[in-house]
Amino acid sequence: MAKRRKSSKNKEKETNWQERVIQIRRVSKVVKGGKKLSFRAIVVIGNETGKVGVGVGKAGDVIGAVRKGVSDAKKHVVDVPLTKTNTITHRINGVAGGAKVMMRPAAPGTGVIAGGAVRTVLELAGVKNILAKQLGSSSPLNNARATVDALGNLRSFSSVAQERGVSIERIYA
């Protein structure tokens, strides 16, 4: 039993997951004796081949908060359908709280034109050519979640073709 657990952990580590911390913030809770300080970390994980997730961790120290954030992000991973030119398949908007993110596919060689947390999420998802704009809130957490929301709602060409009952070539035309 223990060997199986170890092998699953090794497989998890062998895969090419990268993690980036978007924000570390010191937060406080008012208790009877005064203020209790803790840290909140917003973490993005991705394998740069179409899987990405955002997580939040809170702990008494920074390392513990980041570890919890990575664990939370692994629970909220979404698959991103990418084209051959490493862009998204169609225009999409994402919303989380007061943040709204607009994304448009871009031609090869354009690069990732996005700012802040949105850029980090897109890079870890493996998107190489995209135009993105943050609207509304400037909160890194809400912008990251809005980006993941949009990426999770993307549909691949093959799924659309199957849904409509036509060949993929008809969709491209």
Swiss-Prot record:
Residue ranges annotated for the S5 DRBM domain, each copy included: 17-80
Identification of the protein by name: Small ribosomal subunit protein uS5
GO cellular component labels: small ribosomal subunit
UniProt-listed Gene3D superfamilies: 3.30.160.20, 3.30.230.10
Superkingdom assignment: Bacteria
Gene that this polypeptide is encoded by: rpsE
Keywords tagged on the record: Ribonucleoprotein, Ribosomal protein, RNA-binding, rRNA-binding
GO molecular function terms attached to this record: rRNA binding; structural constituent of ribosome
